[in-house]
């Protein structure tokens, strides 16, 4: 019984240790990477794989989730009081909607990827920026149009660009 309790304690410790808190200073990329060195490695890997600039990856994460790994869109209100449905299925650092996230997992052969992991989220953002560059011919260095395509989707972006 004591061994069982120790095992449970160790499991809880590792599970809670894996949960990532929001960085103290989300306005400064150097401070973020100083606090979370692995995030720099993950962002750099996404840059090397997809060509998506690191500052653009961080800007997307900041705008979409403010570095909150559990971020979800706010619920709509029924009769202006009762919490109701969420307007979309977006979740995690990247706030990717379910359909696009599933497409990413299929195309990158990453069946275990989750948007609650920073590594997977910045890889997704890199993939999305790369695909936007190929589909809509938007430069990877054009943050305004890249974010517009990220926010609106590839189909709706054609109307505004």
What residue ranges belong to the model's regions?
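Conserved small/polar residues in nucleotide/adenosyl-binding loops
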Residues: 159-161
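Alpha-helical segment that forms one wall of the substrate-binding/catalytic cleft
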Residues: 93-145, 149-156
């Amino acid at each position: 019984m004591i061994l069982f309790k120790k095992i449970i304690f160790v499991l809880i410790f590792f599970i809670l240790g894996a949960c990532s808190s929001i960085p103290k200073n989300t306005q400064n990329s150097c401070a973020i990477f100083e606090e979370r060195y692995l995030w720099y490695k993950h962002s750099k890997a996404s840059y090397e794989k997809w060509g998506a600039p690191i500052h653009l990856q961080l800007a997307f994460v900041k705008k979409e989730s403010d570095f909150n790994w559990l971020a979800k869109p706010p619920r709509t209100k029924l009769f202006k009081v009762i919490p109701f449905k969420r307007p979309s299925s977006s979740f995690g650092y990247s706030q990717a909607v379910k359909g696009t996230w599933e497409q990413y997992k299929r195309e990158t052969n990453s069946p275990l990827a989750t948007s609650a992991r920073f590594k997977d989220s910045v890889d997704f953002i890199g993939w999305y920026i790369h695909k936007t560059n190929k589909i809509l011919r938007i430069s990877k260095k054009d943050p305004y149009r890249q974010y517009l395509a990220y926010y609106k989707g590839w189909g709706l972006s054609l109307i505004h660009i």
